[in-house]
UniProtKB/Swiss-Prot annotation:
Catalytic reaction equation(s): 3-methyl-2-oxobutanoate + (6R)-5,10-methylene-5,6,7,8-tetrahydrofolate + H2O = 2-dehydropantoate + (6S)-5,6,7,8-tetrahydrofolate
Record-linked Pfam families: Pantoate_transf
EC main group: transferase
Assembly: Homodecamer; pentamer of dimers.
Source organism per UniProt: Clostridioides difficile (strain 630) (Peptoclostridium difficile)
Subcellular compartments: Cytoplasm
Cofactor remark: Binds 1 Mg(2+) ion per subunit.
Binding site for 3-methyl-2-oxobutanoate: 44-45, 83, 113
GO CC terms: cytoplasm
Name of the gene: panB
Name of protein: 3-methyl-2-oxobutanoate hydroxymethyltransferase
Length: 275
């Protein structure tokens, strides 16, 4: 079934949970789509898990477009949402609409996601008015890592929790079709979810959100050096990959690979002409 922003909105009313994962290339996106994932996010998290940076701030709009194109080619049914990276919507309303439009027109995304609350309402309204669906993002917003002093849980005081709820209402009023809640206490995420009519997608925000999203490298266990508290690893793909690569190297070194079944032949009569 084709997933649209209406699918997301209906899911909340029907009590159906929404599943999302990040993806950055054709092959992974194709596998996810074949598993009937509801939505795929081309996240600026690619700065960390693809480029190896310590945060997301260096990611450019052109990089998001590049990876969105790749994901688009592997997807038939999932809703494709592209992140608007740092400074792609902060400088002016015109920049925000232009860059959101590029993600749709050049990248092939179905919607865009941007971080922030009351400070980005005008951007959300303008992008929505340009007929571009918007997903909001509240709580631990990685583009604000320097302001937060690191990747820390948000909304863990009555004052900040109240602000989260108010921001969620403002984002809904501005026309967003859903909101990501990241790094928020479970009870507060539940309060936010119950205060708005659009779905919330949680990442480190507990069980009561309308859906969940994870970075696929985290949930597949590709990196063993650090596992965020909110991540459940459904596999240890990193270990499987290492074992496979080691076996490949061993077989190349010992001459066990390639075998005859992996090789091509030439007609003997043609071969004789070369001698």
């Amino acid at each position: 079934m084709k997933n649209t922003i209406q699918t997301f909105k209906n899911a909340k009313y029907e009590g159906k949970k929404l599943s999302m994962l990040t993806a950055y290339d054709y092959s992974i996106a194709k596998i996810m789509d074949e598993c009937d994932i509801n939505g795929i996010l081309i996240g600026d998290s690619l700065g960390m898990v693809i480029k190896g940076e310590e945060n997301t701030l260096s990611v450019t709009i052109d990089e998001i477009i590049y990876h969105t194109k790749a994901v688009k080619n592997g997807v038939k049914n999932a809703l494709i949402v592209s992140d608007m990276p740092f400074l792609s919507y902060h400088v002016s309303i015109e920049d925000a609409v232009k860059n959101a439009g590029r993600l749709i027109k050049e990248g092939g995304a179905h919607a865009v996601k941007l971080e922030g609350g009351s400070n980005v309402i005008k951007q959300i309204e303008s992008i929505v008015n340009a007929q571009i669906p918007v997903m909001g993002h509240l709580g631990l917003t990685p583009q604000s890592v320097n302001s937060f002093g690191g990747f820390k849980v948000q909304g863990n005081t009555s004052e900040t929790a109240r602000q989260l709820i108010e921001d969620a209402k403002l984002i809904e009023k501005a026309g967003a079709f859903s909101i990501v809640l990241e790094g928020v206490p479970t009870k507060i995420a539940e309060m936010v979810t119950n205060s708005i009519s659009i779905p919330t997608i949680g990442i480190g925000a507990g069980i009561n959100c309308d859906g969940q999203i994870l970075v696929y490298q985290d949930m597949l266990g590709m990196f063993g050096d650090f596992v965020p508290k909110f991540v459940k690893q459904y596999a240890n793909i990193g270990d499987i990959m290492k074992d496979s690569i080691k076996n490949y190297i061993l077989e190349v070194n010992t001459g066990a690979f390639p075998q005859e079944k992996h090789s091509f032949s030439i007609n003997e009569s043609e071969l004789e002409k070369l001698y």
